[in-house]
Amino acid sequence: MSSSHPAPGPAPHRTGVRTRTAAPVGARPRGRTRVGVRHAAAAVALAALLGGVTGCGDGSRSGRDGGRAGHGSGEQAAQAQGERGEHSRRGFSLFATGDLLVHDSIIRQARADAGGSGYDFGRMIAAAKPLARQADLAICHMETIYGPDGGPFTGYPLFQTPPQLARSVKEAGYDSCSTGSNHTLDDSADGVGRTLKAMDGAGLKHVGSARSKQERGRPALLRAGDAKVAQLSYTYGTNGISLPENKPWLVNLIEPERIIRDARVARRAGADVVVASLHWGTEWQESPDELQRSVAKKLTASRSHGRRDIDLILGTHAHVPQAYEKVNGTWVVYGMGDQIAGKMNDPRGSMGTAARFHFVPPKTRPGAKDSKGGSRQWTVDKAGFTPFMMKTSPRHTLINLASEKSRGAGDPAQDEAYETIRKAVFSRGAEEDGLRMLP
């Protein structure tokens, strides 16, 4: 199996071909045997779980930014909502970022930032913290699995990340992370178990991988504004590492029919908004590939009783910023690029975007239908993105390129990254559909 490198080099990897994530400069890949994979069975009903959701995560946003303060009990919230009518329900803001790709150099930097004792990833992603904490809902993509508490910790090609990453991400303001990726099975069930245990301990919701059939049937369920948000997560493959026959639920694979079924189960159980996180695409290609486009069209075209099944698609995996596009009236982020990563042969591997969307509730009262036949449909009224760059020298540091540019800072490398990201994001007409770059 070939490794994944920027051009020039081996041919780029495409969705549907089992591949390894991009290697940092100087990395030497190790091989694995390709084995066929079959996916798990149907999703488990979520009504009881969704009915009990009254807050997001551990509620740490309360008092911090006003986004979720004062929800009260579920009964009180329901009564208040019934009194004021659906037309007065609060909307919510969503913030999402790309791959947390923890190469060896990232591990060393986290060790140094912790003073040589433990690992601290917080300084590296500090530039995302104000935006993540300001949003009502912040979502990350946890591409790599975690190693044992005491290590050893490794980067490419079989990742085992220090579990302290979960705490750093939570402290930065994130609520939930997708975990379905081509590296989910780098250490089989043990790696999945360690990763989800650490995320549970940090108070981070997670979806995309699971420790049991029952857990696989549950999306990440989050409260944002007055909405119940269901997050789903799937990957194109697992680098040829087979799912154990007795544990087919370890990771979710991209199968459009299954994604639609899962979304409908979440809808019937009360989810107002369904977000699908998809690990897909051709590495180092800014344009979405054929499978990305076809899956996006199928998912966004799917309707139940006149209501769309998927409200937003957030893509990862390509390691470069990809286009944003409205497909069948639904926003699709084909690829957000990397949020953190070691130095790549291709400088675009250090570039990424943060997706920023604001959802508003339907204007009709519960059960009423609008003129187009939809019912209870939340919609995006503001769409934006923020360009970021991971500076790799003299230390790994995430930089908000739009903020730097607005205050006249930056350098030629940052200016080039800013323009590269802008062109990629707007390459499929998103600007005409209202997408804006935000600091």
Task: Specify the residue positions occupied by each region the protein language model found.
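Acidic, metal/ion-coordinating pockets
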Residues: 2-9, 13, 57-439
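N-terminal export and membrane-targeting signals
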Residues: 13-45
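Hydrophobic alpha-helical targeting segments used for export or membrane insertion
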Residues: 44-50, 275
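C-terminal motif of bacterial Sec signal peptides marking the signal peptidase cleavage site
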Residues: 52-55
